[in-house]
């Protein structure tokens, strides 16, 4: 691994205010916001954090009744954040394009510091997650002949990029999609990373990212906007991948697959909604929710069949740990909803 020089400095939050929420009906709360949001992280039923375009991040502590909106300032950059992760005491947000900037934010004070910076002109970061309070991972498109993967083992204070000699090689034109902050899925000490473009593969890392293997998938691939957009695990053995062709969202062939052997093999799911940017298991169940700009979809039994439950489209969403609340986001909007209301829409 190559050690990356990290620049630290402390900054203060600006432009903190509360957004008014439109309550459509009991159980559904929506808010308009002046940014595009592709990164969400749910702490519990009532608390959700977001990161988006125009240097913005924020949160709700009251089930989406009110939202706090904050702005990070770094030089004169107009930053777009498409990755967010939350630990016990900190929030981490990562900008998408070069220079890739990763900030650690104190939950109580909302002061923040830069903990990782990558200036390679090819830098493009897609997703970030933490296993626990100490170990975290972020993934980006290749800057050499492998995916860009950076790790932290000290609670996010420092990050190291894994050298390509320790990673599976990437095919030219293979990358990842920064569509929903869900092309990483963590379970136990493993990481599942989804790719797309010229090839659609799943990289599986063990022992907090120490060793890696790449597995081929049957998801549609070969063009710039085809491949896997989202991955989520039910267990170490069982995971689902979803994506498709962003330029032909109505296509349903080869857009969703499941593994029951830890990623070694993947079986296509024929009855699926077509293009999906985010798919998530409802915790402790075999039920799934999926979303894209075409709508929201629901499956009761390991994706065997799907029902469209809303025509309203969202880039991404998250489910609270006990499965009671969901938070959705898209272009200029945030929505919170309890699971009973969602399934009865």
Question: Which ranges hold each PLM region?
Answer:
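Bacterial Sec-dependent N-terminal signal peptides
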Residues: 1-25
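Beta-strand-rich domains and repeat architectures in extracellular enzymes and scaffolds
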Residues: 29-55
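Short glycine-/Asp-/Thr-/Trp-enriched loop segments that recur within the blades
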Residues: 31-32, 75-79, 120-125, 168-178, ...
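Repeated scaffold domains used in trafficking and secretory/extracellular systems
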Residues: 36-39, 79-85, 122-129, 225-230, ...
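Blade-level signature of beta-propeller repeat domains, shared across WD40, Kelch, NHL, RCC1
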Residues: 320-345
């Amino acid at each position: 691994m190559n050690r990356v020089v990290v620049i630290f400095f402390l900054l203060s939050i600006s432009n903190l205010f509360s957004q008014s929420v439109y309550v459509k009906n009991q159980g559904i709360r929506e808010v308009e916001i002046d940014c595009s949001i592709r990164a969400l992280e749910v702490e519990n039923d009532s608390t959700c954090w977001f990161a988006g375009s125009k240097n913005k991040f924020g949160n709700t502590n009251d089930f989406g009744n009110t939202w706090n909106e904050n702005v990070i300032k770094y030089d004169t950059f107009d930053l777009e954040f498409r990755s967010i992760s939350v630990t016990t005491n900190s929030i981490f947000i990562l900008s998408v394009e070069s220079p890739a900037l990763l900030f650690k934010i104190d939950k109580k004070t909302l002061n923040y510091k830069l903990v990782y910076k990558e200036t390679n002109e090819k830098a493009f970061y897609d997703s970030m997650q933490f296993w626990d309070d100490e170990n975290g991972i972020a993934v980006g498109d290749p800057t050499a002949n492998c995916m860009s993967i950076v790790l932290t083992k000290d609670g996010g204070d420092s990050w190291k990029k894994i050298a390509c000699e320790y990673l599976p090689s990437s095919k030219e034109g293979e990358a990842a999609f920064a569509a929903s902050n869900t092309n990483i899925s963590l379970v136990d000490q493993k990481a599942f990373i989804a790719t797309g473009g010229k090839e659609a593969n799943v990289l599986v890392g063990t022992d907090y990212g120490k060793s890696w293997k790449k597995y081929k998938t049957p998801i549609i691939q070969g063009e710039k906007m085809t491949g896997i957009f989202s991955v989520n695990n039910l267990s170490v053995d069982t995971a689902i991948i979803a994506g498709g062709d962003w330029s032909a969202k109505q296509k349903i062939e080869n857009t969703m697959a499941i593994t029951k052997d830890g990623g070694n093999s993947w079986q296509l799911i024929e009855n699926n909604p077509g293009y999906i940017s985010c798919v998530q298991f409802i915790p402790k169940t075999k039920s799934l929710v999926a979303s894209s700009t075409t709508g929201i979809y629901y499956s009761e039994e390991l994706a065997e069949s799907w029902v469209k439950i809303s025509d309203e489209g969202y880039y991404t969403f998250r489910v609270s740990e006990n499965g009671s609340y969901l938070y959705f986001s898209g272009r200029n909007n945030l929505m919170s909803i309890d699971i009973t209301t969602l399934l009865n829409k």
